[in-house]
């Protein structure tokens, strides 16, 4: 049987309250790196992180963005180097190996989201790539407001460029273009998407 993302998310939510209190919890500050441990996975209870690597010349490559309910950890990747950076204050539960089989749904979500982001990164032109990345962020970290969909996670232009394999200057120019066209609004360093006004 194939389950939809919404079904899986609901399943995670229904089990989260019974599972999480049994596990040790840790709190990390913004920009702190979650320790590289191969013997645990981390379930995010609050906050947001990004997973990333970097090339030989030091260029950062963002691999994913993760929020509450997501399961993250070094055992989930074979990429080297690999780092989990906190974008906000983050609270996680420490999930030991003998409980990983209880988190199959969360692991499925992890795979689905990684593939979604990978497909976005290869979209052309770059304007479509950026717009679909913003839509993806709004679905994961957004909420409905009167003007549209507010992305509550503050992602810098440089961080967007690192995800989308482009330059910060290009991201800044395209965001200004989207704003001029009425497709997005700025609100206290956050972005509001006006999804109905943009045609893919």
Regions found by a protein language model. Give the residues of each.
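A structural signal for short hydrophobic beta-strand segments in well-ordered beta-sheet cores
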Residues: 42, 84, 183-184
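Polybasic "coupling" helices that flank or enter modular domains
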Residues: 105-166
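Phosphate-/nucleic-acid-contacting segments
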Residues: 141-200
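Glycine- and acidic-residue-biased ligand/ion/polar-headgroup-sensing regions
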Residues: 39-56, 67-69
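Cyclic-nucleotide recognition modules
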Residues: 61-116
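Cyclic nucleotide-binding regulatory module and flanking cytosolic helices
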Residues: 1-30, 37-40, 67-72, 77
